Amino acid sequence: TKETLLKAMKSRDAGEHPVFRECEFKDMDLSGMNLHNMDFTLSSFQNVNLERVNFENCSVENALFDGNSLHGANFQNANMKTAAFRGCDMRECNIKGANLYGAVLEHAKLDDIQSDEATQWFRMHCPETGPILGYKKCVNDRVVQLLIPADAKRTSATLPSCRCSKAKVLSIKSFDETEEFEEAWSLVDENFVYRKGQWVEVKDFNEDRWMDSTTGIHFWMERKEALSY
């Protein structure tokens, strides 16, 4: 409850990190509260006003924030890994130094969000311009090497996986690279075929970078990443 949070804030010693793991916060107004250095791992916030809340140095790893207002909240140096922020108002949030690996930002409002060079997994993982090489794993453990041209649209969310609108198939090899193949089939769409030397293109490419599981040619920047998928 809000009262429990207030009590923990008042009674904690300097440097103490109160733990609120796997807690459920529902139908309350926490706006403007100073919750720095707290552990909210795996907790859920449902219909909670979190505007201007100070989450500095907090862990909200794998926490659920879907649909709440976090307008102006401070997540500086916070662990935000795999947290869900679907549909959240995150305008003017401070995420400087925060780690957003795997965080879900689908349909979140991100206008004027503040990040810096220390912010992890918020910027595009793949180069935004120029031609690049990519790799993807297909049916029967065939690994496809792709050339993504300079004019191809490309995106990435908060994971190493990327998407592009078109690519040329350079090679198709086995995991150990001892065998080569002429074609390979997508793990997601069995009708999508990659043929050596040919171009593949997705006409209805979704340009929303925060929509991870959507239309596009999914690829990885490193071959080893594709192998472990």
What are these regions (language model features)?
Residues 12-16, 197, 216:
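Glycine-centered small-residue hotspots that permit tight backbone geometry or close packing
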Residues 127-214:
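Non-catalytic interaction/regulatory modules that flank or connect domains
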Residues 2-3, 163, 220:
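Low-complexity, intrinsically disordered regions enriched in charged/polar residues
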Residues 1-141, 154:
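Tandem repeat scaffolds
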Residues 209-229:
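Extended catalytic/binding region for NAD+/ADP-ribose chemistry, centered on the ART fold
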